[in-house]
């Protein structure tokens, strides 16, 4: 965590490093890599002390400790108008990508399953040129 420092961290099946961002609210995911669809699925995130802003084509990253199955969480979010997709699951935590830009205090997310939850960043959705 140095000024202007950026970390690029991979999504690995046995690590919920992204859950630690709930305890480090100044650190945010601001990019999901690769950014181009033709390069394959997103497998890493860029993290820094930045304020993320909407771009018009965003995905928001949200964490929950809910013991419910991912499908049940997706259904609960969907009932509240939030489109979600499971990104990773490890250490009792689940990481979801939410279609659109959501603020940390969004009431729809406050109603979502889990006692330890939160937005940990946002990034543009994948695109192709």
Question: Which residues fall in each region the model found?
Answer:
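Domain-level signature for soluble enzymes in the chorismate/prephenate branch of the shikimate pathway
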Residues: 1-129
């Amino acid at each position: 965590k140095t000024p202007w420092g950026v970390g690029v961290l991979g999504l690995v099946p046995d690590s919920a490093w992204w859950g630690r961002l709930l305890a480090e609210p100044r650190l945010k995911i601001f990019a999901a890599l690769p950014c181009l669809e033709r390069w394959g699925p997103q497998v890493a995130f860029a993290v820094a002390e930045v304020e993320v802003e909407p771009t018009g084509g965003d995905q928001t990253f949200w964490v929950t400790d809910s013991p419910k199955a991912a499908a049940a969480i997706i259904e609960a979010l969907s009932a509240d108008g939030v489109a979600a997709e499971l990104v990773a699951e490890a250490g009792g935590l689940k990481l979801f990508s939410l279609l659109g830009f959501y603020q940390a205090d969004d009431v729809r997310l406050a109603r979502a399953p889990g006692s330890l939850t939160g937005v940990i960043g946002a990034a543009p959705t994948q695109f192709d040129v």
